Amino acid sequence: KKNANEKMYPASMTKVMTLLVAAEKLNNESLDQKIEISIEATDYSFKNECSAAGFLVGEQVTVEDLLNGIILPSGAEAAYQAAIMTSGTLEQFVDDMNKKVQELGISQTTHFSNPVGIFDENNYSTACDMAVILHAAMENEICKKVLSARNYTTSCTQQHPQGITFSSKFLNRIDRKFGKGKVVGAKTGYVNQSRYCAVSMYESEANNKYICVTGMAGKAWQTVYDHIAFYQNYCK
């Protein structure tokens, strides 16, 4: 461990908690439910200069589309809409995120102020805590499916007749570079204060599971090599 318990700003790794809190309010039957994308969701993404999944105002997408839109393209509008869908208001959803933080026993060192990972002094965590959050998410079947997806195409809508295809650049890159075992879930992020960061779970050929959390990479591709180096050097 290096700086494992130091305060960090988790950027879009925050969305692992967003996914978990939303998923725990859902079941498999609700994944096909249709949700309309609101102008508030797209405005939130635009005004905060966030990455977006590409959903449009008035578009009717499934809950499953929404959840995948949170993680693979790191869509802020998807995270916002999921928060409203499951908690009613953004403020209540953030409260629910912090209740989950308490439940996981990490409230002394982790606190969330938004579901996207927008930089805020009150949106912070540690590498160890992010590992705890990813582990909890991977125990949830809905979350596990989303976090492990390499590619996903949304359902067809009037606005996107062919759907939208999302890809996990991190997982697809690591698959090409690393052939032993498998990285079974991941989320990347970026804010100036943490540079490029990522959290991932690896399952070795011996079926042992490991979680790696890194930050301060100068380039997005460097996070891939950071995680490969960790898994090669420390995992059996």
Identify the meaning behind each predicted range:
Residues 84, 88-236:
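Penicillin-recognizing serine hydrolase domain
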